[in-house]
Amino acid sequence: SAIWARAPKDITEEQYTEFYRHASHAFDKPWHIIHNRVEGTVNHTSLLFVPSAAPFDLFDAERKSHVKLYVNRVFISDTTKDLIPSYLRFLRGIVDSQDLSLNVSREMLQTDPKLAKIKTSITKKVLGELKKKSNKAPEEFTEFWTNFGAVLKEGLIEDPSLRDRVLELCRFTSTHNQGLSSLSDYIGRCKEGQEAIYYMAGEDATKIAQSPHLEGFKAKNIEVLLLSDPVDEFWLQHVTEFEGKPFKSITRGAADLDNIAEEKKDENSKENVETPDIADLIASI
C-alpha cells in the first residue's frame, strides 16, 4: 500500500527518507517530516517533508509546487497551484483526498472549494509544526530559517489571515548578539520607555551593521533589527506593529531616544562587558 496510507508508527525513519528521496528526486535527508490524516469537512492525508537544503530555484517566480496531489491514491497533478501557498513552496511530498472528484479537470480543480479547505488545513498544520520545532529545538530551527526564512516571510504579505502565526516564526539579526532573535525576544529586551521596535533595512547586511545611523542606539544600548532580505521592505508595508509596539525605521525621521532609560553603569555591572563589533558579528553568520 502507499506509504502515506499506513500509520506513522508503522513507518521507520529510513522508509520516510527513502520515499522522500524517490518522490522529490533529492539526496538530502528531510529536516522535518509531517505525516497527518484529517477527518472532517474534507478528508485528506498529507505526507510532507521540509528539506534540509534549499533548492537552487527557491526564488524562481516560475517554480512549481513539489507537492503531488492524489485522489484515492490515483495521481492527479504535480502542478496544482492552489494546494500549497507560495510561501511554503519549499515543501515536498504528497496530499491524498478521497473527497475530491477523480473526473474533474485540472482547471476545474483549481476552483474547487474543497481544495481551498485542504490548503488552509495543511498551511495551519505546517505553521503549527514549525512553531513546535522552534520551541523544542531552537538551534535546529535556525538551520531551517537560514534556508527558508526569506521565503516564509512572504506569507506576511500573502496571507493576512495567518500573518500573526507567520510573524511568531520570524527570526532576525540584530545589534544584540550574533544569533537570531524572535520578535518576542526583542520585546523582552526592550528598555524602559521604549515604545517602538527599531529596525534598519537595506540590501547589504555588512553595510547596515556599519551604518552611522546605529551610533545613537549603540550609545544607549538600544537594540536595532538589521533587515537585509529583499522581502523585508515589502512586508513592513503590511505589518505595522507587534504586541502593541510599532515598527520604526531608524533612517526615516529622527528617533526620540530621550525618554528611554539610560543604562545604569557601575564597576560590577554586566553592562560593562565589551560589546562585540556588530559588523564582525554579521560577517560571522
Name what the model sees in each region:
Residues 1-285:
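Conserved GHKL (Bergerat-fold) ATPase module
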